[in-house]
Curated annotation (Swiss-Prot):
Residues 1-10 have a biased composition (Basic and acidic residues). Residues 1-34 are annotated as: Disordered. The L3 protein is a component of the large subunit of cytoplasmic ribosomes. One of its GO terms (biological process) is translation. One of its GO terms (molecular function) is structural constituent of ribosome. Belongs to the universal ribosomal protein uL3 family. This is Large ribosomal subunit protein uL3. It comes from the Eukaryota. PROSITE patterns: RIBOSOMAL_L3. Residues 17-28 have a biased composition (Basic residues).
Length: 398
């Protein structure tokens, strides 16, 4: 190929192989941030559900740039994060082969939403006896001593403590009834403090505001949109063949040499596209808060210092194919993996960011709450009524 006078780099990334369907529907955390025992005891991850996207307007703080102190428009993603429920803790010991599970302690009362996750078909299962034997330990003195002994053993021998928490899917407008379960590592403080923190939060809810904060960088772990079986043009981005090519254009002409007499794994082939497990690092939190009031008070989560309109984060008519966000939410810069309603795992950033963009404090000037179905650019129902007037069908008869 020495006669070539143009570049022809390979198409497609070999860093994500095999390109097959993910084994789990939710994002799996394979590593947590490094523990700093000088900090206060805290959780390092949470779970949420993708609601949809909108856009915001803000002033860019980037000295030296032509856009410094000028307005820019950015896309943001809204992730609804109902409170998570803590039901247990796991202690890990360090071995030559890595971390190994030492002991697991469960809470006394476990909801059916959590127990559904342990069954392939909860409806057809006749027994539903999961944890019935374990829970009886809390009813006897010997059982309580056994649980206390397990906690003491974890405090003495374990180096890593993680709580077991599950989402409350019944609070969302989803057809799913099985809760998503997640192990969340507890960082900060000594092992004794971590175990005491976990036990004190048994059968209690944890809010996302207690885990993350505004202007913080987090990692988003999830499964991408599924595209099904696709060809090499869409799957790998290779070049189409010339128009007069025999037996098809959207193919790879040469799939390798005669010998070795097998097709190399680096050759683009047709197959599964999408529904892959992916991790997106360092997504910035632009806003965090409660979407709708719980006690009847007015909450203006869509309000800014420059836009004083009383409105929530929800667009008119709700998010398309999702509905209204009612619980706590995160507003992240850019897009994240997966379709609407997809369960996402949110983790504190593994890497420490010291760049100017990472340390920039975000001040939003405007949050778009217009209809995502294409019904005009009106931000609230009052604006739309003021512009169009009262409809004839809604006007009262004299």
């Amino acid at each position: 190929m020495s006669h070539r006078k143009f570049e022809a780099p390979r198409h497609g990334n070999l860093g994500f192989r095999p390109r097959k369907r993910a084994a789990r529907h939710q994002g799996k955390v394979k590593s947590f941030p490094k523990d700093d025992r000088t900090q206060k005891v805290h959780l390092t991850a949470f779970m949420g559900y993708k609601a949809g996207m909108t856009h915001v307007v803000r002033d860019l703080e980037k000295p030296g740039s032509k856009m410094h102190k000028k307005e820019i428009v950015e896309a943001v993603t809204i992730i609804e994060c109902p409170p998570m429920y803590i039901v247990g803790l796991v202690g890990y010991v360090e071995t030559a082969q890595g971390l190994k599970t030492y002991k697991t302690v469960w809470a006394q009362h476990l909801s059916d939403n959590f127990r559904r996750r342990l069954y392939k078909n909860w409806y057809k299962s006749k027994s539903k006896k999961a944890f019935t034997k374990y829970v009886k330990q809390y009813e006897t003195e010997e059982g309580k001593k056994s649980i206390e002994a397990s906690l003491q053993a974890i405090k003495k021998r374990c180096s890593v403590v993680r709580v077991i928490a599950h989402t409350q899917v019944h609070k969302l407008k989803l057809t799913q009834k099985k809760a998503h379960v997640l192990e969340i590592q507890v960082n900060g403080g000594s092992i004794v403090e971590k175990v005491n923190f976990a036990v004190a939060n048994f059968e209690k809810t944890v809010n996302v505001t207690g885990v993350f904060a505004e202007n913080e960088l987090i990692d988003v772990i999830g499964v991408t949109k599924g595209k099904g079986f696709n060809g090499v043009i869409k799957r790998w981005g290779v070049r189409k063949l010339p128009r007069k090519t025999h037996k098809g254009l959207r193919k790879v002409a040469c799939i390798g040499a005669w010998h070795p007499s097998r097709v190399s794994t680096t050759v683009p082939r047709a197959g599964q596209l999408g529904y892959h497990h992916r991790v997106e690092r360092n997504k910035k939190i632009y806003r965090i808060g409660q979407a709708q009031p719980e006690d009847g008070k007015q909450i203006s989560t869509g309000k800014t210092e420059f836009d004083l309109t009383e409105k929530t984060i929800n667009p008119m008519g709700g998010f398309a194919h999702y509905g209204m966000v009612k619980h706590e939410f995160l507003m992240l810069k850019g897009c994240v993996a997966g379709p609407r309603k997809r369960a996402l795992t949110l983790r504190k950033s593994i890497t420490t960011q010291t760049g100017r963009a990472a340390l920039e404090k975000i001040t939003l000037k405007f949050i778009d709450t217009s209809s995502k179905f294409g019904h005009g650019l009106h931000q609230t129902a009052e604006d739309k009524t003021k512009y169009f007037g009262v409809k004839k069908s809604r006007s009262t008869k004299a």
